[in-house]
Amino acid sequence: MVYPIGKRIIPPIVKFWIKQANGLQNVPKKGAFIVAANHASYMDHFIIMSTLVPYLDRKIHHLAKKEHFDNIFKKIWHTWVGAVPIDRESGGKEALMWAIKALNQGEIIAIHPEGTRTLTGKLQKGKVGVAILALTAKVPVVPIGLIGAFEILPKGKYIPKMRKATMNIGKPMAFGKYYGKKINKRMLREVTTRIMKEIARLSKQKYNFK
């Protein structure tokens, strides 16, 4: 019940904070894939979901830390976005397994490879969870760069400013050359870096991590 209600109410409201969404044609209409975006603000979820869900008319599952389910308002929002709680202290293995199963069933998973919101507005080092999902489920990654979301609602603030964000969507990234090979740390870091560099390009930033 929460999902259909939220689908009608939330996007028109969030639209006031969105300047433009570029590259929607790059988002696959069918099949499983991963949406990977930079994490600049709590507004990131609203902007991504309010743009992609109406466009695709499909539910997108979002991986979120379990603390986002600790009150009724947060719980309603995260239920709408199909969020799966991650216990970061345990490494989030349970949520990753759930996400892999969902991808294998043709679902869409949204994730922020950095793992947490930035304090400065700049990109942080990406964690390998996104690579684990992409290589294990053998699905493409759609990179997204958000520009301006940090200025709307930076970490530590609770009232969004009336500014506008731009969402740049890149072409799906395929990692077929790794399929069939034993997944190792080097491979995971290599794939993660490729994804983060594309997110950096789309968000007009630099990614200086290896």
Segments from the language model and where they lie:
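Short hydrophobic helices that act as membrane-entry/anchoring signals
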Residues: Y3-I18, K75, T79-G82
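Catalytic core of membrane glycerolipid acyltransferases/transacylases, capturing the structured
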Residues: K29-S90
